[in-house]
Every structure is written in C-alpha cells, then in structure tokens.
C-alpha cells in the first residue's frame, strides 16, 4: 500500500513539473507578443517548479528502497576467502612458463624446436613437481 502512495506522489510531482514547464513556455510566448522579453518568470511558476521537483524527488527516494552501506565490508561479508580474489577470466595457460620451467633433462631435446610451438604438448612440470 505504501509503495502506491509514493508512486502517486511521484506522479503528482511529475504532472506539476510538466504543468510548470507549460506555464513557463506560455508566459514566454506572451512576453514575446507584448515585446517584453527581458522580464523574468513570475514567482508562482518558479515556486511551482521547485515544489514539484522536491515532491517528485521525495517520492522517488521512497520508491528506491533501502540504500546500501558505503563501506566495503558490507559487500565482502557474504563472500568466502576462496572467491574473494578468484577471477577465472584471467587464467592463462598458454604462456612462456612451459618452456622456462622445464626440467633440465628435457631442455636438450626441445632446443631445436621454436619456443611456443603449437605442436608441443602443454607440460606443467613445475606444478607436477609440487604435487609429488
């Protein structure tokens, strides 16, 4: 029920804002006809514009709901440590590490091949040594 009240308030504010814009345009055309183009808008149009803007903004703020906290702890509270810095889109497996970190006995057989050749199999010898 409360959200329909705020939506109605926003509707009234926007309607009043459109009415104020129409009144300002009508006043300007009247000033052109009377050749008094240097006069400002009447105070009632200015006040209607400001009041309509405030009413529309007040209704929009209540429709938007609860604001989030600005500190980072509120966003990080529901994340685990494993997913905090885990970015799978940055994983790269085709890099120069497979050539640089080969065991010394296999370096001699691969010296004739060009580095980063596509036909050589992907060897993660450094990771294999860590798992042993």
Swiss-Prot record:
Belongs to the membrane magnesium transporter (TC 1.A.67) family. It comes from Xenopus laevis. Its main location: endoplasmic reticulum. Keywords: Endoplasmic reticulum, Endosome, Golgi apparatus, Magnesium, Membrane, Transmembrane, Transmembrane helix, Transport. One of its GO terms (biological process) is protein insertion into ER membrane by stop-transfer membrane-anchor sequence. It is a multi-pass membrane protein. Residues 23-43 are lumenal. Component of the ER membrane protein complex (EMC). The keyword Lyase does not apply. Residues 1-3, 64-132 are cytoplasmic. Part of the endoplasmic reticulum membrane protein complex (EMC) that enables the energy-independent insertion into endoplasmic reticulum membranes of newly synthesized membrane proteins. Preferentially accommodates proteins with transmembrane domains that are weakly hydrophobic or contain destabilizing features such as charged and aromatic residues. Involved in the cotranslational insertion of multi-pass membrane proteins in which stop-transfer membrane-anchor sequences become ER membrane spanning helices. One of its GO terms (cellular component) is Golgi apparatus. Pfam families: MMgT. The keyword Electron transport does not apply. One of its GO terms (molecular function) is inorganic cation transmembrane transporter activity. It is found in: Endoplasmic reticulum membrane; Golgi apparatus membrane; Early endosome membrane. InterPro entries: MMgT. The chain crosses the membrane at residues 4-22, 44-63. This is ER membrane protein complex subunit 5-A.
